[in-house]
Curated annotation (Swiss-Prot):
Cross-referenced Gene3D superfamilies: 1.20.1250.10
Record's protein name: Prolactin
Pfam families to which the protein is assigned, alphabetical: Hormone_1 (PF00103)
Residue list for modification Phosphoserine: 55, 63, 119
Compartment annotation: Secreted
Coiled coil among keywords: no
Any one GO molecular function term: hormone activity
Keyword Ribonucleoprotein (UniProt): no
Function: Prolactin acts primarily on the mammary gland by promoting lactation, mammogenesis, mitogenesis and osmoregulation.
S-S bridge residues: 33-40, 87-203, 220-228
Keywords: Disulfide bond, Hormone, Lactation, Phosphoprotein, Secreted, Signal
Gene name linked to the record: PRL
Any single biological process term in GO: positive regulation of lactation
Known partners and oligomeric status: Interacts with PRLR.
Source species: Trichosurus vulpecula (Brush-tailed possum)
């Protein structure tokens, strides 16, 4: 009986992993413009549809990856109390909830999303390389980290196109929050190193959730005239 349950559990986990990968590939297969197209112009509505989809598929595996790491490496270590307010993006003034976000002009909110996404380029790259070097790191964590890194680049590209349509010719300087956590990810001390991973994944989950909410709010405001 125990063998059957283990087999069923393994099959369900494999199914969930394959479903997650399928959703990522579905998003990845949606080109911004057809191959070889010249002067392609995608509607703002379509760009927002794609951005909202991408942000959702970044936040979902970010949460799963954090939960898996927490369960496997962080139990009993008291990491959560140390992780509060220690994200590298804390220097960016981000609204904490929908009510605060609604008070911000759409141009400022768009630029804020760009800054947060740019702030994750470097840490996501190093997250992938350092997870590869972890002993006994689950393949699911590595595969999610790799997918999130790729989808973050795609979302940033899409957001730049959205800003280009909403405010044509108004190019913002590439402002972002610098991450300096690589030495901590490479520490010999296990507790220090594991907390660095934990904190990075905690912040990724937090920021991906914020971006997901901001994009839904902006889509409602700019595409549906706040009628949603």
């Amino acid at each position: 009986m125990g063998t059957k349950r283990s087999s069923l559990k393994g099959s369900l986990l494999l199914l969930l992993l394959m479903s997650s990968l399928f959703l990522f590939k579905s998003v990845e297969s949606l080109p911004i413009c057809p191959s070889g197209a010249v002067n392609c112009q995608v509607s703002l509505s379509d760009l927002f549809d794609r951005a909202v989809m991408l942000s959702h598929y970044i936040h979902s595996p970010s949460s799963e990856m954090f939960n898996e790491f927490d369960e496997r490496y962080a139990q009993g270590r008291g990491f959560i109390t140390k992780a509060i307010n220690s994200c590298h993006t804390s220097s960016l003034s981000t609204p904490e909830d929908k009510e605060q976000a609604q008070q911000i002009h759409h141009e400022d909110l768009l630029n804020l999303i760009l800054r947060v996404l740019r702030s994750w380029n470097d840490p996501l790259y190093h997250l992938v390389t350092e997870v590869r070097s972890m002993q006994e790191a689950p393949d699911t964590i590595l595969s999610k980290a790799m997918e999130i890194e790729e989808q973050n680049k795609r979302l940033l590209e899409g957001m730049e196109k959205i800003v280009g349509q909403v405010h044509p010719g108004d190019r913002e300087n590439e402002v972002y929050s610098v991450w300096s956590g690589l030495p901590s990810l490479q520490m010999a001390d296990e507790d220090t190193r594991l907390f660095a991973f934990y904190n990075l994944l905690h912040c990724l989950r937090r920021d991906s959730h914020k971006i997901d909410n901001y994009l839904k709010l902006l889509k409602c405001r700019l595409i549906h005239d706040s009628n949603c």
